[in-house]
């Protein structure tokens, strides 16, 4: 195989890795919320969408640079998640069907609210010119922005791992996940843990939305498609941080390779078939999390 033959395939691999990185950020938010709170958050896609619209609004009104839009999106969407958790979700813990329906209702409210404020026309998030250039690495021509995405993802994964495995708060989260009653007997406030982790998961979805908004158009319905991929990453990964990292890389690269060989639509079909077969033989995912009493 010549360098000319290898180059498109190498570019496809890098493309898959960068897309998988954004899926991973969104999936980490889902993993945090489900693993700690036990809530299947149907509004997670709308948190992604809110992050994209936050970046768009800050750019169009204040002229805020893209890199500053990322932490701003995190804060704004985390606050929205905090309000939703305090105002609704906390009253529905240990009621899976009710939380499922409630978060689905929240997703519809958020979607229609954004449509009323911004309209249904597509919006775009701009990045600095330096991010729009390419660099030659071996056989591949890599987008600088995609390399920035990989760096941001690595930073978020490292920060999340440190928070949950090297801090007092992380110890409290893991204690609540294993046994809420036992954790309470040691003075751990489970409600506070739930509140913070829900907001944190929402904020991470906001960052993912800002990154997705650069690679695609920003629409009120954009979160629906992206949250499916995030759920797949969580399920295949087994609901753990390291499992999500492995699952995001695996699914992203597989879809990219399939799309390179066939097309995007058939690539998704093949990926979903493989996931169904995988879950048939390993229903708890790559790295299953130990379940305790909530």
Which stretches of residues belong to each language-model region?
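Cytosolic-side transmembrane-helix boundaries in multi-pass membrane proteins
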Residues: 8, 98, 178-192, 261-294
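Transmembrane alpha-helical segments in multi-pass inner-membrane proteins
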Residues: 63-75, 195-205, 209-275
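Single transmembrane alpha-helix segments in multi-pass membrane proteins
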Residues: 8-59, 83-98, 236-239
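Alpha-helical transmembrane segments within multi-pass membrane transporters and channels
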Residues: 63-107, 113, 247-251, 282-283
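Transmembrane helix-bundle core of multi-pass membrane transporters
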Residues: 2, 91-166, 193-196, 262, ...
